[in-house]
């Protein structure tokens, strides 16, 4: 099931790239780079809240008079960490510490005004987490896990002129092993 999901995500990203590569000269591409940050919530057996911050870069293509498609990559870090007791067994302790998150997504936007667009996104994400587990009656274990997942999201991007823009975005990530992430971020960037 997960293999089919990742195959579908790769197909969507490849299709968006193909659309951009075959765009007519009148629908030139726009490159962009940004910084962003906001709220991060990671949940599974232990829920952790914190801040996320990072950078992103992408390219957008005009598909129709008010419709854009794009590809973007992000590198984010998180301060979300939390410990819980009696999570898997009585007296145990489980701590989760969210680390970096890499993502590659495709997005489709619709211009709601001359300066603003709403958009939806979907793609691949890979989160790194540090997990500490103390079973209370045995040796403690520390491990770092890289978890693959699916990212979905939606947002609004507003241009201020001279290529400057801001955005607000909601992201949902569903990783292997049942881990989930919810993020609300704001970003500032430049398109060129």
Named regions from a protein language model:
Residues 7-20:
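Bacterial N-terminal signal peptides
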Residues 3, 22-192:
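Gram-negative outer-membrane beta-barrel domains
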Residues 1, 15-17, 27:
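Terminal low-complexity, poorly structured segments
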């Amino acid at each position: 099931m997960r293999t089919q999901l990742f195959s579908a995500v790769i197909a969507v990203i490849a299709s968006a790239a193909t659309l951009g590569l075959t765009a007519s000269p009148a629908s030139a591409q726009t490159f962009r780079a940004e910084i962003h940050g906001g709220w991060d919530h990671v949940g599974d057996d232990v829920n952790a809240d914190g801040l996320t911050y990072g950078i992103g870069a992408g390219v957008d293509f005009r598909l129709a008079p008010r419709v854009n498609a794009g590809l973007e990559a992000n590198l984010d870090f998180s301060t979300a960490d939390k410990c819980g007791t009696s999570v898997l067994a009585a007296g145990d302790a489980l701590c989760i510490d969210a680390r970096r998150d890499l993502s590659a997504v495709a997005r489709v936007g619709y211009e709601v005004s001359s300066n603003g667009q709403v958009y939806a996104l979907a793609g691949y994400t890979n989160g790194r987490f540090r997990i500490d587990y103390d079973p209370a009656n045995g040796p403690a274990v520390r491990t770092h896990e890289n978890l693959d997942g699916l990212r979905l999201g939606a947002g609004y991007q507003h241009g201020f002129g001279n290529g400057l823009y801001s955005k607000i975005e909601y992201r949902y990530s569903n990783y292997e092993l049942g881990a989930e992430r919810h993020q609300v971020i704001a970003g500032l960037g430049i398109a060129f």
